[in-house]
């Protein structure tokens, strides 16, 4: 009998603590969620060449990067580049740079 009374008391206590308060305390928790538009305004996407636009000196782009990617896509050129270097492997497969 005591166990049933304790169980009933625990259920009532849990119910009273879980109910939302009528004094508007949920207004604080509603501020935690923002709309998609507000979120998009708050978080700006970083530009691709941000360092060049802001005046901060960054590393200049490598002019051979496109050729390096072409050589990496060819398994034979990529293997040869591991052995003798990228520029020489590219020259042997695709002609002078």
Curated annotation (Swiss-Prot):
Binding residue positions for Ca(2+) 2: 69, 72
Disulfide-bond pairs as recorded: 71-77
Signal sequence annotation: 1-20
A Gene Ontology molecular function term of the record: hydroxyapatite binding
4-carboxyglutamate: residues carrying this PTM: 65, 69, 72
PROSITE patterns reported for this sequence: GLA_1, GLA_2
Record-annotated Gla domain positions: 49-95
Record InterPro entries: GLA-like_dom_SF, GLA_domain, Osteocalcin, Osteocalcin/MGP
Residues noted as binding Ca(2+) 1 in the record, renumbered to the chain: 65
Post-translational modification summary for this protein: Gamma-carboxyglutamate residues are formed by vitamin K dependent carboxylation by GGCX. These residues are essential for the binding of calcium.
Keywords attached to this entry: Biomineralization, Calcium, Cleavage on pair of basic residues, Disulfide bond, Gamma-carboxyglutamic acid, Hormone, Metal-binding, Secreted, Signal
Prosegment residue ranges: 21-48
Gene Ontology biological-process annotations: biomineral tissue development; bone development; cellular response to insulin stimulus; glucose homeostasis; negative regulation of bone development; osteoblast differentiation; regulation of bone mineralization; regulation of cellular response to insulin stimulus
List of residues binding Ca(2+) 3: 72, 78
Family: Belongs to the osteocalcin/matrix Gla protein family.
Role summary: The carboxylated form is one of the main organic components of the bone matrix, which constitutes 1-2% of the total bone protein. The carboxylated form binds strongly to apatite and calcium.
Protein name: Osteocalcin
